[in-house]
């Protein structure tokens, strides 16, 4: 696409922007913070800004680096940019943080000396953590001797990932645990509200509930044992020449910090930095952004985020990044708040604002200049007179039935299925709803494919495998799983017989090797 064609395409898109969006696009130089609420067209301004840079400066597409949080965001931005600037969209560097770090590593193998490493598989990661659990001392609270002895694999995996994403060390976590424990006596929930006697100890109203504090300290202190295992995990990974995606960001940060010329090469190459979904960046991702702007008086860094939409906090994301960015460039920063919403009706926006305003950690509560009152701006949405309704159910089952019945009623009124949408917080609720829809023969489409491991037969197979693994580790240790397995319809064992077996085992007071397994072995041989 030549410059004239680019200009025509850009003007076509630019003419549709509202004043706030135009301000964000027009501010090419210096640090910019765009607070983009839901449905305010942030992807459009990111692509329009890139078009503006290419039109009004002498820089090339490969002088622009755009970092997104997810692959979906990267694909959406590339597609929107291609519509505007054509084939040059593929010359603009649009990366997730991980793909950018991988590119840096591949371009500078000699700095990293990681050419002999391979990415760790999920199975390998689980095996490494099992090795760590096997090496735990007997008094380690994370070590189990009955049931699923590797129960903590999932939680340790999550912790180690968070430590890498945030750049935390085991010492840092221990310090935070100590800080948390020391603060417990200052918390209102540990002050007795009335006279209480528990375990022979009487607490008067206003007394410090030392029993609850000790219980909380005992629970949180387990984190110290888990953090201690992190270094061993890293040692095992190195021993087996393995790495994971979180390692890549830390490697690049370390090399940039220790090799100023290399960092400066990338700073020179990328004259414009754009960061999408900034509220969801982790500690290490934010460190990477700061390094790319290091010692530049007024960096051309453009970040888009919304403190009300931080959805990846459990993955290490930290909404405080927006606040830190605002404070860092306070005297140079251009703030832009997108207020025009093109997705929802005003009544929905007003309801959501009345809820989110209770959050005292919002930017608008800390910075009076940031006003986040979204205004419905789509022509179709402006004509809507429907009001949100709140339905309260006693339990989850009743809620699922209620939603299904409402949809069935709408279909009976002639509303077509494609005009009905269900939004849920967690995927598991979608799985449950699908069961009800199938029962009522309600046609549906889900973007989320059915998980093989959630199919009833798969669940049964997994339970059987868990039982075998537990028995292989410690014999006669998984009667609870066996009790569940015996009820599977594939075995056609009468429930009465299973109950008799449980009673017989209980009457035997669990003498040596007396278990459901032993009982049924004898029952089968004598039947």
Question: How should each PLM-predicted stretch be described?
Answer:
Residues 134-146, 238-242, 261, 362-365, ...:
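Surface-exposed helix-capping loop/turn segments at secondary-structure junctions
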Residues 143-147, 170-178, 239-250, 265-267, ...:
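Short coil/turn segments at secondary-structure boundaries
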Residues 1-79, 91, 219, 268, ...:
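Conserved motor-region signature of P-loop NTPase helicases/translocases
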Residues 523-527:
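Short, intrinsically disordered, charge-balanced linker/junction segments flanking boundaries
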Residues 1-35, 40, 44-47, 63-65, ...:
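Accessory N-terminal region flanking or inserted into the helicase ATPase core
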Residues 63-175, 320-323:
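Conserved P-loop NTPase-based nucleic-acid remodeling module centered on helicase motor cores
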